[in-house]
Regions:
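Active-site anion/phosphate-binding pocket segments in diverse small-molecule metabolic enzymes
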Residues: 1-152
Length: 152
């Protein structure tokens, strides 16, 4: 029965399910920094900018259930476009490269799982990135993350 609340089915990829019936996961953009070429970010400076780069800091991390395995490999949606996670997923934040999109507003919605415009990232895709199943991705979302349930 709980699967009905998430929109996940073991029979179909999420891209074949009506998007309004699926779980989504959002966060606001909290900070924006421009870093010069050669500057590093994140734990151990694992991301080094190859050019002047705009980095958005998002208030979500592994303490919220956002897997550290998404470090350097996941993406999020901002303004309907995919932007890459750069550096390691930290306890309370992730950083994404927003150099190639329009300027952002503080608090602008960032989609971690869901749809923005014509682009989408669903739990099954996130699961593929980290070698697990969609159920684990959704069950891993921590208790610090508020839930909002909408009726159909």
């Amino acid at each position: 029965p709980a699967l009905c609340c998430t929109g996940i089915t073991p029979c179909l990829p999420q891209s074949q399910i009506l998007t309004s019936d699926q779980s989504s996961h959002f966060t606001p953009r909290s900070q924006l920094r421009t870093i010069p070429k050669g500057c590093s970010v994140s734990y151990n400076g694992t991301f080094v900018a190859k050019r002047q780069t705009r980095i958005a800091v998002l208030p979500i991390g592994y303490a919220d259930g956002y897997s550290r395995q998404l470090s350097h490999r996941g993406s999020v949606l901002i303004q309907g476009r995919r932007v890459p996670i750069v550096g390691l997923v930290c306890m309370d934040m992730i950083m994404v490269d927003v150099t190639d999109i329009a300027p952002l507003e503080v608090g602008e919605t960032v989609t971690l799982i869901g749809q923005q415009g014509k682009e989408s990232i669903w739990a099954d895709e996130v699961a593929d990135w980290i070698g697990t199943i969609p159920y684990e991705v959704l069950c891993g979302i921590g208790s610090r993350v508020p839930r909002l349930y909408e009726s159909a």
